[in-house]
Amino acid sequence: AQQENARALMALVAAFGHMQTKDPADPAVQAQVQKLQAFITEHYYTCTKEILHSLGQMYGAGGEFTANINAAGGPGAAEFARKAIERYCCG
C-alpha cells in the first residue's frame, strides 16, 4: 500500500506538468492543488496550508524532489507545482 500511495502521490504532482499552459491561479490548477492536499491528508498526515506551502517550496528547490517530479511530469513541472501551491496557500 505504501508504494501504491507513493505512486499515486507522484502522479498527482506530475499532473502539474500537463497544466503549465494555464495560469497557476486557474481553477483547474487550483483544484489539482486541493486534490494533492486532500490525498496527503488522507494517506499520510494532516496537510495544513502551512505544510503544503513548505512542500511546494521543496518541490521547486532544485533537489531530488524537483528531479523526480520533472522526470514524471516533464520539464518545469516541479516549478509550476510550486507556483500553483504558493498561489493556493498564500493567495
How would you describe each model-predicted region?
Residues 1-91:
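Amphipathic alpha-helical "stalk" segments
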